[in-house]
Amino acid sequence: VATVDCSGYPKPACTMEYMPLCGSDNKTYGNKCNFCNAVVDSNGTLTLSHFGKC
């Protein structure tokens, strides 16, 4: 199972770095920062489906 360590999030701003991750909501996130901010916003209901685009 793929996991991402989101400790230290949310961050106020994310870089534009493109390293896509696919969330359990079937949405592609541009990078870990964007994904982790969304995880925090979801109160932990969002998880990583896999690395790369959905």
From Swiss-Prot:
One of its GO terms (cellular component) is extracellular region. One of its GO terms (molecular function) is serine-type endopeptidase inhibitor activity. The record marks M16, E17 as: Reactive bond 3. InterPro entries: Bifunctional_prot_inhibitor, Kazal_dom, Kazal_dom_sf, Prot_inh_Kazal-m. Keywords: Disulfide bond, Glycoprotein, Protease inhibitor, Repeat, Secreted, Serine protease inhibitor. Disulfide bonds join C6-C36, C14-C33, C22-C54. Glycans are attached at N43. It is found in: Secreted. The keyword Kinase does not apply. Residues 4-54 form the Kazal-like domain. Gene3D superfamilies: 3.30.60.30. Avian ovomucoid consists of three homologous, tandem Kazal family inhibitory domains. This is Ovomucoid.
